[in-house]
Amino acid sequence: MSEAANPEYNPSGVGDCIDTNKLPWVSIPNISGLSIKPARASTESGIFSVILKLEAGSSLPSSIYLGGMDMLILSGQIEYDQDGTKSILNPGTWGFICANSKVNAFVANEDTEVLANFYSGVAFLKDDGSLASIFTALDVLSLAKETNITLVPNSLSACMEIEGEPYRGNGEPLAITATENAGKLVDEPVSESAIGSEVTHPHFVDTHEVPWLVLPGMEDVGLKILRVSEETGYISLIVRHNGVAAPHTHIGASDFLVLQGRLGVRAGPPEGYGPGIWFYEPAGARHDATQRVTDEDLIYTANLYGPIMFDSGPGTQIESVLSWKEYKGLAEEGGIKLVPSTRSDDSSLLAWAPLKASS
């Protein structure tokens, strides 16, 4: 992708992405060993997206998730013990916890970094099960403001306004940027992988074990479909994007983190965006040319919060619309066992009395 293809690129502006490698780790008050790189926080929906860092021996406390939460282990190792069984979550493990779940602590066996999207607040519990504190999008906004971090805008109009400027302090790169091939987190065959997880809980899946699928007419784009919600229409994927995406509009928003390769967009830098760049495409965002800019596989995570509409260019007829139905159908055809959005027999669901502080 050349400079001529990027006439709208403004290297000093704040748009729909943030380079998490240039952000500092911001400590979470009252939780030892836990810090975050904040990316987005919505005052409308309460959703917030962060990269968590747990120091070796520390933990994300036992919690009640007031909304859903999805997560991908980027580096390190987490131990999760619930219902008498233990899961060892290594890099490449993806999980989803539904709203109102009471979940035991996630313990870091070594320094661990996790991409996490919280769909609402999370209530941290004391050892006796009473309420210790509640962490919400407002806390993320407050921490970002205190640290002079400008978060990714939540709407198309906010992206167009491009207020603020990127963080100018000293950042700390993600651990995945030090690896030769971060795509191995999700792409290395199980038979060759030395980092496979021991997953015993239905909330999680080792993405190494999920095969790549393709949609008809999009053979250059591989998909590992992880979760499809019929209730919300949300879809969670790993994408291997080696072709040119047809012109499209995001009817619903989406977010993604580049793991490997470099992503080129028309209004982006000529060299593209590499590992550690986190994107949020607001509802209504349009792309007429999205592609990789090197010969390396372009691999990224993706959450789609609504359908994508494809056409041949501005003002042309709609050619297709991809919604949760198409992704679920593709998963069923491929024999994929999706991570469940909720389970009536899940002992972590509603396994608690109403939240209250200790007397």
Spell out what each predicted region is.
Residues 47, 69, 111, 234, ...:
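Conserved catalytic motifs of the protein kinase core domain
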Residues 1-46, 134-231, 321-359:
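A short, N-terminal "cap"/entry segment at the start of jelly-roll beta-barrel domains
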Residues 65, 74-75, 94, 100-101, ...:
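Aromatic/pi-system hotspot detector in well-structured domains
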Residues 55-56, 64-84, 241-244, 250-268:
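Glycine- and acidic-residue-biased ligand/ion/polar-headgroup-sensing regions
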Residues 70, 79-104, 108, 230, ...:
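Short acidic-glycine-tyrosine-enriched beta hairpin
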Residues 52, 74-76, 91, 113-117, ...:
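Short, well-ordered beta-strand segments in beta-rich or mixed alpha/beta enzyme
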Residues 96, 109-128, 279-281, 295-314:
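A short hydrophobic beta-strand segment most commonly corresponding to one strand
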Residues 19-20, 29-65, 86-89, 98-102, ...:
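Conserved short histidine dyad/triad with adjacent acidic residue
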